[in-house]
Each structure stands twice: as structure tokens, then as C-alpha cells.
Amino acid sequence: MTSPVNKLITREPVLISELATVKEAACLMSEEDISCLLVADAQDSVSMIGIMTDRDLRTRVIAQGLDYTTLVRHIMTPAPITIDSSHFVFEAMLTMLTHNVHHLPVLHLGKPVGVIGISDIIRYESHNSLFVVSSIFDAQSVEEISALIPDIHASFTRMVNEDANSHMIGSAMSVIGRSIKQRLLALAQEQLGEPPIPYCFLALGSMARDEQLVLTDQDNALILDDSYNAELHGEYFLKLARFVCDGLAECGYSYCTGNIMATNTRWRQPLSVWKGYFTEWIEQPTPESLLNSSIFFDLDGVWGQTEWADELTALIAKKAQASPHFLACLTRNAINRKPPLGFFKDFVVEKDGEHRNTINLKRRGTAPLSDLIRVYALAVGSTAQNSFERLDDIIAANILPPGRGPDLRDALEFISMVRIRHQALDLEADRVPDNNIEPEQISPFERRNLKDAFQIVANAQKFIVIKYPPNRRF
């Protein structure tokens, strides 16, 4: 997965002029024994302006009864999704999964040097999350999706054993989670009929941040068109929400104990209401508002009018950046969960209960880091969702002392990987994965570095209090 994508290229790309006919294109594809052509600008034979696939011929020409003299330019997909030859196989896989494309032109210095397809990645990377996602979209029922849970777990452990980093693993698992949501929504619409008004299904929390692992509950919501009428449309969207949330539960995503789900009427509202929610939470940061902010300000549209999610993200960034009082209040929440280090820098473990002598790496490690990074990201107006991408924006804005940004990145990566490896070991031992590690069960190297990582978190919490004093009125 960490090999460069150019390793997948088996031949030079075949280009055809945008002014060629679809018959000429079909003949060329047959002669070359290929499933797609790159479409060249009529004025520049090496500049790609589109792509045409065998699927396009079937669905846009034959099925529509178009004449075979139709020009390629009229049935091609313009400005196709591409990838640079220096990127990794993993990134190519994610790009294809995210955009649901089967052919991906590869560029070098802006010019096409090849095209890779799903079969190329399958040949190069057998038994990975691409198979899982493909199987999810082929599933005809919730039961068929839930039957893929062992494959999802196997994909996770494979990535861990191949030394993928936490960003790669989190992104891949989040793509799988989104795919399950998307397939459930498609199945729901098959059962309920087309929606009466447009809507957007939101993923929240770790999935929105591309940081999902194998142990997670579901946090989701619905944005409805502003034409929403509860009497006319309410029953449809309640049934849709129940279908999806029940399906997610059956597929291993447990119900949210805080009821942050689309089945909750409060979180199934028109776009204008959502804008009102977010504006109120920022302008009137009560304890409940701050709790909601920490959940809903990591959001991603996975189905429907996904541009509404982008609209809300932009609103959050603009209003939060302009509100020092809100940032100060959010800081108070961000420092509530302390890293598990004692006065003498020894580990502070749970004293009793079923998790006695353990540390919860999510609650005491990655979650406090995500909270800190979110505050800084909002302060610089970042619209990024992923914690590593937020750190890129934070570092670029120069609001941290030299070295602090990279330190936070290293701490997040190390704590995340200890947590990830622990869950992979649980799965391989047929145990239910959790976030609780026993310090004595990890290597001395990991213990030393885990203490260093927790100290970075503790120092960052002290610094953010100075930068955004929670008790100061603005």
C-alpha cells in the first residue's frame, strides 16, 4: 500500500481526440483491448480533458440510442479525478473508493502517463479494504453487509501488520464506514421510495475526521431541505433514519448512548435550523452547547446534498474564529480530560472495576489531543476535519511556539498506533477490541515513548490555557 502508484502502470495511456466519433472510440478500445480512453483536447493531442469508458458506451450511447457518429466530447466524463504518479497505492485506493470511480488516470508533471483500474489494485493489493467496500456496495440486504464484519476486521489487522500509519488506517476504516452508511441509505430508499425532498446524511465524530477504528459507536444526523414539512415528510425521514441506525447497529456500530443519531428528532432538521444551532452554540457557549460543539463540529456529508455539510463547516470556521470567548470556553472543555501521568511522571491507571490497572488510550490520549487540535483549528479558521490535516493548517498559521506542532503530530501518531496495535492484537486473539491497555503488557520502549507522548499532551493543555484563558471575559 505504501508503494508509489506508478508501480501499477502496465502500459502507456491511449488517447483519442474529443472530435472523434464514438464508433471510432469503440474500435480503438477493441483494437487496444482496453476498457477506457483518455480524451485529448482537439488543439493539443497530449492534454487530457476527459475520460471515456466502456461503461460510458453502454449507458450513454447504446442505452440512450445515440447515433454512433456522436462525438466523444458529448459522452465523455470531463475533468476526471486523477492522481499524481508520486502518490501511494493506498492513496489511489482511497481516491477510487471516495469518488466511486473505476479508472484513475495517473499524471506526471500534469501529463497522463497511464491509467489504473480496480483490477490493477486488486492484482497488486489482494485482500484489502477495496474488496470490502466492493462487497458492501454489492450487498442486497443488511444481513449481507453485517456478514462482512470479519472481512472488515481482517482488513484492519492486515493494514496494521503491514505497518500502515494511523492516518492511513483511520482513513481506510472511515471509507468502509461511509460505504456502509451509503449502502444502507440506498437500501432504505429502495424500500421507502425516493425521498420527498432533498436531504444530506451526516457522519459525525471519528468517521468525519477519517480517524475511525474497529471499535466505535454511531454518531449521525440528517440535514433536510428548508421546504421540510413535518406532517408531509416527517414519517419518511423517521423511517429512513431508523432503517439506517438499526442497520448500523447490526453491522457493529453500536447505538450512541447520548442519542446523537438521526432517529432523534432534534438531530433531523432543516438546513436553516442547523445553521441556527451552530450559531447559538458559538454565541451562547453553555455547557450543553460546548458538548454539542465537540461532537457536531466534526462533520462530513456522506449522502445526498453533501455541499450542505461543507456550508455548515464554513459557517463554523468563520463564526468560531471571530469569537475569542467561544474559543476560551471550548478550551475549558478541552482540558477536562487529563493525560494519565502522576506527579513523578508515572502512569495513572484505573484503580477498580473491570478495567483495573489499565489506561483508556482514547479517553486519556487521543480524545484530549483531538479536542486541543480542534480549538486551534477553529482559531485559525481551518475547515479541515482530520486531526493531522488540522495540524497542517495550525502549523502554517504559526500560532504555536516552534516545534510544538510537530510534537503534537508525533504524540497523536504514537498514541494512536499503540491503541491500534492493541485492537489488532485483540482481534487476532478473538477478543472484543477495546481501548484499554495495561502498561506492564507493552514493551519498555512503548512505555517510555507513551509517557513522552502524554507529557506533550499535558504541556499542550497548559499552553492552551495561557493562549485562551477559560476564565477571561472577552
Segments from the language model and where they lie:
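Conserved helix-loop functional segments at active or binding sites
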Residues: E31, A63, D67, A186-E190
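A nucleotide- and high-energy phosphate-metabolite-utilizing enzyme signature
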Residues: V133-F474
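Tandem CBS (Bateman) regulatory domains
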Residues: M1-R11, M48-H99, P112-M159
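Short beta-strand-to-loop transition segments that serve as allosteric relay/switch motifs
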Residues: A42, S119-I121, L224-Y228
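The conserved cystathionine-beta-synthase
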Residues: L15-D33, A40-D41, T82-N100, L107
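A cytosolic small-molecule/anion-sensing beta-strand core signal
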Residues: D41, T53, M76, H108, ...
